[in-house]
Amino acid sequence: MALLQISEPGQSPNPHQRRIAVGIDLGTTHSLVAAVRNGAAECLPDAEGRLLLPSVVRYLPQGRRQIGYAAMDSRSEDAANTLVSVKRFMGRGLKDIDHPERLPYAFVPGQEGDMVAMQTVDGVKSPVEVSAEILAELRHRAEDTFDEDLYGAVITVPAYFDDAQRQATKDAARLAGLNLLRLINEPTAAAIAYGLDNASEGVYAVYDLGGGTFDISILRLTQGVFEVIATGGDSALGGDDYDAVLAEWALQRLGIRAESAQDKAAARIAARACKEGLTAAESALFSARIGGNEVRLDVLRGDFDAITSALTERTLAAVRRALRDARLQREDIQGVVMVGGSTRMPQIQRAVAAFFGTEPLNNLNPDEVVALGAAIQAHQLAGNDPAGDMLLLDVIPLSLGIETMGGLVERIISRNETIPTAKAQDFTTYKDGQTALAIHVVQGERDLVADCRSLARFELRGIPPMAAGAARIRVTFTVDADGLLGVSAREQSTGVEARVDVKPSYGLSDDQIARMLQEGFATAGEDMRARALVEARVEADRMLMATRTALEADGDILPPGERQSIDVLVQALEAVREHEDASAIDAATQALARGTEAFAARRMNRGIQQALAGKSVQSL
């Protein structure tokens, strides 16, 4: 008798066909790995039942190393070989690191554009290699849990990570032996864990307050489509700042000062413990050994809330900016997802609830929520959930464009554009007979190339010689789902094409991105004036070049008086071009254009006469 195979709808009847895929939160201080088990996402523990893996690697002689808790215990005794928080160095050069002399590492100077590296007893190590060690440790944990090889992983990155930092993360995954299914933004992963689990739709805010940074993302969920419509934050604000304020306040109340680095560290540690105590109680003890003496102070939650209220307000200011970018009011937000251990502070919970007029979603562990969301996405990308129809649309943190004549930026893809995306724009040549075009790809919010960041340069050659402005070159920008950029240029008539994949050797820090955004807002008026001046000068140069070329070729057809008038207009434009008045340059350019209209008509008539010379009416 034949037996029928029965399985749950949407699931394979063969359990061995299930692909093991995990989500990884590669964090600055701690990392986690999660997977969907028995229909629910959960973080995977190590052999001792611990979920968090400290993002620390210690290198030892003869190729030996310690990872995680074992390495963390050796930070003080072997600081030079114990590499901590290397996520901050991913995709960054040595010149991008603030005060490298204050860090215990022996940084290795490299070529301009090289990613920073550190000298250890086991040789020179890059942040990519260190991150790969952490990823490999998490991969082994997952494989031990399931007793089989992984199919792939989804890894989360900060929303502000640029091309170089994302590429460095992809390289680390490959080095760790992981099949990278996708990179997704951390707030997006958190939203997946909440929004999809609860079958919610609408507009949501993801409020992510970690130890060192604050990120806010505005997302729209509609029929399974998750779209990030705005991002923002403060890369110099986190739980550590709350610790610092509390430590300084406590020492002032005690009437003492922390002079040495050891005393300052002790005060910070005591402040953090006190802050964590105030999460669950109305008062907690600040206790530290300062200057060889034990000091103690009872701290009330109300005092802590009062002295740190300015920090909390800074997070809300960033939220307001993100809402403006999304063109939304706070009343449009259906729910708020809380991410990061610092959101456990009661004052944060109250402030967010009061701002949005709704209680934030906090039923998931804020330390784990990012990894859980990544696991859900990995589960679907591995094909284990055919019924899942989720689509993620992240956004670009800074505008992308190319340099045009005069050092101006022509934006192709604007900030907060959803990805993956592709945008194209047509350009032309500036000079007669131009057969090549240099493409300079830049990133930023300013109007001048000098104020933006250079990403790549390449050339399109083989353009047919034509009059200036006749050629048509289509420049196409494509950004994939991982946020990596490709740029191509194609001459339309011949099909000749050139392309570059933008993988800069190091990228922008969160601080630099935030600074570039702030400068873009603060200098908008100045940039508009500068752009108008440059555009006026470029048009003046084009008009002067065309006039000189025409005079050299056909100046003999001009009556002496008309030639003199044109020369006067040319001299006037040349003189005013050196001034800083865009409107005056425009006026002089238009005057020259009007003054050469009759000359242009005579040139056209001569050209027609030359073309018809020697031909009969019948032959035409």
Curated annotation (Swiss-Prot):
Record-linked NCBIfam families: HscA, PRK05183.1
Keyword Membrane: no
Family under the similarity heading: Belongs to the heat shock protein 70 family.
InterPro entries attached to this UniProt entry: ATPase_NBD, Heat_shock_70_CS, HSP70_C_sf, HSP70_peptide-bd_sf, Hsp_70_fam, ISC_FeS_clus_asmbl_HscA
Protein name as it appears in the record: Chaperone protein HscA homolog
SUPFAM superfamilies the UniProt entry points to: Actin-like ATPase domain, Heat shock protein 70kD (HSP70), C-terminal subdomain, Heat shock protein 70kD (HSP70), peptide-binding domain
GO molecular function per UniProt: ATP binding; ATP hydrolysis activity; ATP-dependent protein folding chaperone; unfolded protein binding
Keyword set includes Transmembrane: no
Superkingdom of the organism of origin: Bacteria
Record function comment: Chaperone involved in the maturation of iron-sulfur cluster-containing proteins. Has a low intrinsic ATPase activity which is markedly stimulated by HscB.
Signal peptide segment: none
A Gene Ontology biological process term: iron-sulfur cluster assembly
One Pfam family hit: HSP70
Keywords (A to Z) from UniProt: ATP-binding, Chaperone, Nucleotide-binding
